[in-house]
A protein has these predicted regions:
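Non-catalytic structural scaffold of enzyme domains
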Residues: 41-149
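Tryptophan (W) side chains
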Residues: 33-34
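Generic extreme N-terminus detector
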Residues: 5-6, 37, 48
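Aromatic (phenylalanine/tyrosine) cluster motif
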Residues: 5-7, 11, 15, 28, ...
């Protein structure tokens, strides 16, 4: 699996990625798990170390809006965010590839001991949600049904 990914624990306050321009990507099992983007995000977390985090993933950084809303509604929860910027956009990929990508990311998030996962990607929610819900022993939520309410 080649390419860059954006993986971050989400912390309270402003996170200026420009300040990381000269940083080197961290490697996890010889894969790069985050990349530098010249953007500014306002992301929120109340660091509660007594509970497992909620994992959130998207095909890029758009899921940070979902993460922000989770933190607004559940201020005592921790969040681990994974943005798959290496393979964005998902809309042009096959269903089998979307399911494969989702499985890989869920396995990674499980290594971070998350207690639930939110698939913040519409494409992955539509194509992979039912499959991964059956395969993994962790609550997995998509964004299509909650967004339609």
């Amino acid at each position: 699996m080649a390419g860059n990914f954006f993986y971050s624990k989400v912390y309270k306050g402003s996170f200026d990625i420009k300040s990381l321009e000269n940083a080197r990507p961290r490697r996890y099992n010889s894969k790069i798990w985050w990349s530098i983007h010249k953007r500014r995000f306002n992301i929120v977390e109340n660091k509660n170390r007594n509970t497992a985090a909620i994992g959130v993933f998207d095909s890029g950084v758009g899921g940070l809006t979902v993460t922000r809303e989770i933190m607004r509604q559940l201020p005592n929860e921790n969040v681990v965010y994974f943005g798959d910027t290496a393979r964005v956009p998902y809309g042009s990929k096959s269903k089998n590839n979307i399911i494969r990508f989702s499985r890989q990311i869920i396995r990674f998030l499980k290594t971070k001991n998350v207690k639930a996962i939110v698939i913040a990607c519409n494409t992955a929610s539509a194509l992979a949600l039912e499959t991964v819900k059956e395969e993994f022993d962790i609550p997995i939520i998509g964004v299509i049904v909650p967004g339609a309410r």
